[in-house]
Structures are given as C-alpha cells and as structure tokens.
Amino acid sequence: LTVVYPGVRDTLKWLSKQGVEMALITNKPERFVAPLLDQMKIGRYFRWIIGGDTLPQKKPDPAALFFVMKMANIPASQSLFVGDSRNDVLAAKAAGVQCVALSYGYNHGRPIAEESPTLVIDDLRLLIPGCLGAGAEITLPDTDPSPSGNSIVVVTRKLWMKVIKALARWRWRA
C-alpha cells in the first residue's frame, strides 16, 4: 500500500510550474522507482531518476548529487536536497548542497535534526511561498539566487519509497 503524504502533489506541481528541475535519488534499484512514481501519478515531475544501481556509489556518497548537478548544469549553491535520512544529509553535506530534512519518514527512529541539516521541516508545503500562511515559507541561509530563475531540487530515495523521503508511505516487499 502506497499513500502520498499530504501536500506532496501540491508541492511538486508548484515547483514544476516554477521551472524547478527535480531529480529523485534513491539507494533502491532503479527498475522499481519509475513504475511506482507513475502509479502514484507523480513520476512526470522528475527529470532524472537515479537508483542505487545507476551509479557504482550509493548515498551517503555524493556521486549521485554531483551527477544530477552536472546533467542540470547547476552548481551546488543553487541546489537543494530534500531528504529524510542520515544518508541524505551526509550526501548533501559532502556535495556542498543545502539540505532540507523532513521530520517524518525514514531515519531508523532517530530525530533527523541530530544530523544537522540546513533546516528541518514538518510539512513539505513549506517549500511553497505563502501556502501555509503569510511568511510561512522557508528561507535558507546564504542561498545564492539563480540568475536564470532555474534551480534544482534533488529529492531522495524515499520519494518513491516514501516519496520525497517522507512523501509516501510504502513498505518494501522483496
């Protein structure tokens, strides 16, 4: 059973309308990711899907983030990684990318704040300015605005297993 968390579709739709290119990075095999995203009707939002078998390295190694940033031709200073696990935060830090961590999702029962991400949020809709009320949107410290208006949001492995590392509830069954 897969359930998309509240606000996920709205957030992905809004980011897409803003021209934000999004990628999904997961340690799970790539062949399972796209069908699940399509089943949940959110696959179209992701330009790149990087599975655990796409590259030789897996998170927390930053190789997948570097790969996506190279493909998007966007520097780390204009990228944002959304995740819900220690591996996500470590990968983002190693790539020099700011990381927004979701307080719910996959982190082996440990508070994600222990990993010291750039910011911890409880609702993905905080990525949408004004969605949860005036002034509710997030502001990351020292962000370098993109001159072209394009940026990339890299979402992680649970985006198909938890959709955006907390976006969906799904129990892996081998």
Locations of the language-model features?
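Short, acidic loop-to-helix structural element flanking the phosphoryl-transfer center
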Residues: L1-L24, E30-A34, P62
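Glycine-rich phosphate-binding loop signature in dinucleotide/nucleotide-binding domains
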Residues: Q18-V20, A72-Q78, A134
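Short secondary-structure boundary segments
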Residues: N27, D53, S85, L102-Y106, ...
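Conserved H-loop
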Residues: I42-R47, P75, I121
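Conserved Lys-Pro-Asp/Glu-containing loop-to-beta segment of HAD-superfamily phosphomonoesterases
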Residues: K58-L90
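Acidic, Mg2+-coordinating phosphoryl-transfer loop and its flanking beta/alpha structural elements
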Residues: F81-L119
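Membrane-proximal basic amphipathic "stem/tether" segments
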Residues: N150-A174
